Every structure is written in C-alpha cells, then in structure tokens.
C-alpha cells in the first residue's frame, strides 16, 4: 500500500493531479481545496489513501492528515463513497465539518450540490459520536503533549503510524510525548524519524 508520495506536480485535471516521483507519474484524486493549493512544477508531499478494487487501484491524496481522516470518516456514512467524500471536502474543511456536526447544522451540508436533506441528516446523525470522539481524543493529546506545530489529530496519526511500524501503543505514546517535550516545533516527518532512530539505538 502507498502511504504517501513526495514528488513534483506534472499536471492537473478537474479532480486529480499527476505527481512525478523519480520519473514515474502517479494519478492521484484530490479535493478541490487540495488541488487549489498545488502548483505545476512544484514539489509536495501528499498523504495517500489507496483503494484496491478488482477492476482498479485508485490513489487519493491529501496535504494534511486531518483531511485524510475526514475523507475516511465521511465514507462511513451510508450513501457516501469516495467521489462524494471528495466533493464535500472540496466545499468544507475538516474543521467546518466537525463544527457543523457538533452543532447539528444540516444546512451547511444541504448547501453542497448533490447533498440532499436526507443525506445531510445522515451525515450529522452518523458522524456525531465519531467526531465527538476525535475532538475529545485530540484535546487530551494536545494537553498532554503540549503540541504546537503538530495538530492533535495529526499527532494521533503519528502514534498509529508508529504502532504499525512495530511499537506498542504505550511505547508510541511515550516516544511522541518525549520528543515533542524536547522539541515542540518538530515536523511530523522528523517526529517519526526521531522515534524510529531512538528506538533502534536502544536495541
């Protein structure tokens, strides 16, 4: 599975971008908000969600981990697939969605073309508990880790990434806490690299 791509923007379409990684062009679908921030010829890192189906393999790219999380979160709603999830994220930021769901504001979703009253209601109802869980977990992480440069949701993703790389959850949380305490402005990439380096040096 592809987790991220770092490369140069070769070209763009209405709903996708071609990222050139060492001469190989990857077609990556993205939201309008993400596409609007990409410039041809410039280098970017995109967080990738890979969808493997019998008839195709599609890559979906995001400039932030938050957008990737909400892309998957939206698809947990009955009636929302990848295209609709991207369409919603083209109109609303993850923060917009979080606030709307917490406030039970269906109108913000109904204002999006293709989202009717019933779907707007399902989004609010089905995401209410999930968004609240993200909010609460993020607040706890932010408070305990004193995060400045790294957002709460992103820090949680770093912990998950470290667990996938062989850390126990306890080890991952302690590693992230220790590193950010020493360097609150550290980037996500450097945080993961430092955690891995520190772990390897202990063996």
Curated annotation (Swiss-Prot):
One of its GO terms (biological process) is DNA repair. GO terms for molecular function: ATP binding; four-way junction DNA binding; four-way junction helicase activity. Residues 150-203 are annotated as: Domain III. Keywords: Cytoplasm, DNA damage, DNA recombination, DNA repair, DNA-binding. GO terms for cellular component: cytoplasm; Holliday junction helicase complex; Holliday junction resolvase complex. Residues 143-149 are annotated as: Flexible linker. Residues 64-142 are annotated as: Domain II. InterPro entries: DNA_helicase_Holl-junc_RuvA_I, NA-bd_OB-fold, RuvA, RuvA_2-like, RuvA_C, RuvA_C_sf. Its main location: cytoplasm. Pfam families: HHH_5 (PF14520), RuvA_C (PF07499), RuvA_N (PF01330). Residues 1-63 are annotated as: Domain I. It comes from the Bacteria. It is found in: Cytoplasm. The RuvA-RuvB-RuvC complex processes Holliday junction (HJ) DNA during genetic recombination and DNA repair, while the RuvA-RuvB complex plays an important role in the rescue of blocked DNA replication forks via replication fork reversal (RFR). RuvA specifically binds to HJ cruciform DNA, conferring on it an open structure. The RuvB hexamer acts as an ATP-dependent pump, pulling dsDNA into and through the RuvAB complex. HJ branch migration allows RuvC to scan DNA until it finds its consensus sequence, where it cleaves and resolves the cruciform DNA. Belongs to the RuvA family. Homotetramer. Forms an RuvA(8)-RuvB(12)-Holliday junction (HJ) complex. HJ DNA is sandwiched between 2 RuvA tetramers; dsDNA enters through RuvA and exits via RuvB. An RuvB hexamer assembles on each DNA strand where it exits the tetramer. Each RuvB hexamer is contacted by two RuvA subunits (via domain III) on 2 adjacent RuvB subunits; this complex drives branch migration. In the full resolvosome a probable DNA-RuvA(4)-RuvB(12)-RuvC(2) complex forms which resolves the HJ. Has three domains with a flexible linker between the domains II and III and assumes an 'L' shape. Domain III is highly mobile and contacts RuvB. This is Holliday junction branch migration complex subunit RuvA. The gene is ruvA.
